[in-house]
Amino acid sequence: MKIVVDENMPYVEPLFGALGEIIPVNGRTLTPEQVQDADVLLVRSVTRVNAALLDANSKLKFVGSATIGTDHVDLAYLAGRGIPFSNAPGCNATAVGEFAFIAMLELAARFNSPLKGKVVGIVGAGNTGSATAKCLEAYGIKVLLNDPIKAAEGDPRHFVSLETLLHEADIISLHVPITRTGEHKTLHLFDEARMMSLKPNTWLLNCCRGDVIDNQALIKVKEQRDDLKLVLDVWEGEPNPMPELVPFAEFATPHIAGYSLEGKARGTFMLYQKLCELLAIPATKRLSELLPPFHFKAVELEQAPDEKALLQLARFVYDLRDDDAVFRNGFARSNGFDTMRKNHKHRREFSALALAYHGQSEVDWLSNLGFSGVGR
């Protein structure tokens, strides 16, 4: 069995090595010739999976995408050919939620404007938006959720209109899929008028899809509104972001919010489980067996951390400033965006860091944030 796989997917060999011949490829430049005799195709969001790619292949048994979204996959085409498909919903939700939360802590420290006491509006209450809300609520932050689709489906959580969210939120974090048409279109959801209407000193974070924000309009808005603070992990025109936009962001990264070691491993692992199910063979591997030990055994707390100390704990796990510096130095180089993604050092999630503290009830919120070993 030939398994064609994006070369940037981790843990492919230990998970799939016993199932067939693994053929690593560049996902962004994948050609029909490279997949014409594949039995299994494993991709990420950089690969367009459609008739143009797969028409020459008559033996494909399974397509898997180690992603939350599926907008890069022609699902109707696969269904029409009877090719099973699976993605990995929620695989990197924790990573994105923690990235957004850490970015807010970093902004709070940079501008001496505590996160505690602010109101955060989350646009899109799916996996990543919910994970962001979980972090914020664990820390005691008021969260407003906007998701008209979830609301219409009967989701029991309380939702507000986008207009209410824009009026009340001090911080806005975007977590919607890209939808280009229809009643709930998200393409350029944040256009010039909407961004100009934001409250003074709003923080705007985009960790979903670059074109949810009109990037050209964002440049115009920032030229008029220095009070608007930006965290941009995604960009219109990826892998070629607008060079003039980058300096306007307080933190800028190359679409790596979901790039935790746990999240990336979880995405590959979910596809492994699905393929084993399809082949009717037992899934004998375990996710926990793949992850290396964290470089800190534990951090002992003498007292419950304040916001400054919480940021330091977060930096033990992931220092956003490092990725920001790498991005600014490398995004304009030839293939710089994709090279940074490919070579990104795998950060860990909060769960990798064990905290020891005698008064456990005072730090239950750290457990809810995701840190392990809290209390003793």
Swiss-Prot record:
Positions with a binding annotation for substrate: 45, 67, 259
Keyword Oxidoreductase set for record: yes
GO molecular function, a single term: NAD binding
Entry binding sites for NAD(+): 147, 233, 258
Gene Ontology cellular-component terms listed: cytoplasm
Disulfide bonds: none
EC number(s) stated in the UniProt entry for this protein: 1.1.1.290
InterPro entries: D-iso_2-hydroxyacid_DH_PdxB, D-isomer_2_OHA_DH_cat_dom, D-isomer_DH_CS, D-isomer_DH_NAD-bd, Erythronate-4-P_DHase, Erythronate-4-P_DHase_dimer, NAD(P)-bd_dom_sf, PdxB_dimer_sf
Active site: 209, 238, 255 (proton donor)
GO biological process entries: pyridoxine biosynthetic process
Reactions listed under catalytic activity: 4-phospho-D-erythronate + NAD(+) = (R)-3-hydroxy-2-oxo-4-phosphooxybutanoate + NADH + H(+)
Involved pathway(s): Cofactor biosynthesis; pyridoxine 5'-phosphate biosynthesis; pyridoxine 5'-phosphate from D-erythrose 4-phosphate: step 2/5
Cell compartments where the protein resides: Cytoplasm
Main location: cytoplasm
Keywords attached to this entry: Cytoplasm, NAD, Oxidoreductase, Pyridoxine biosynthesis
Top-tier EC class: oxidoreductase
Known partners and oligomeric status: Homodimer.
Known function: Catalyzes the oxidation of erythronate-4-phosphate to 3-hydroxy-2-oxo-4-phosphonooxybutanoate.
Family to which the UniProt record says this protein belongs: Belongs to the D-isomer specific 2-hydroxyacid dehydrogenase family. PdxB subfamily.
PANTHER family reported in the protein's UniProt record: D-ISOMER SPECIFIC 2-HYDROXYACID DEHYDROGENASE CATALYTIC DOMAIN-CONTAINING PROTEIN-RELATED, D-ISOMER SPECIFIC 2-HYDROXYACID DEHYDROGENASE FAMILY PROTEIN (AFU_ORTHOLOGUE AFUA_1G13630)
HAMAP family: PdxB
Protein name, as recorded: Erythronate-4-phosphate dehydrogenase
Gene name of this polypeptide: pdxB
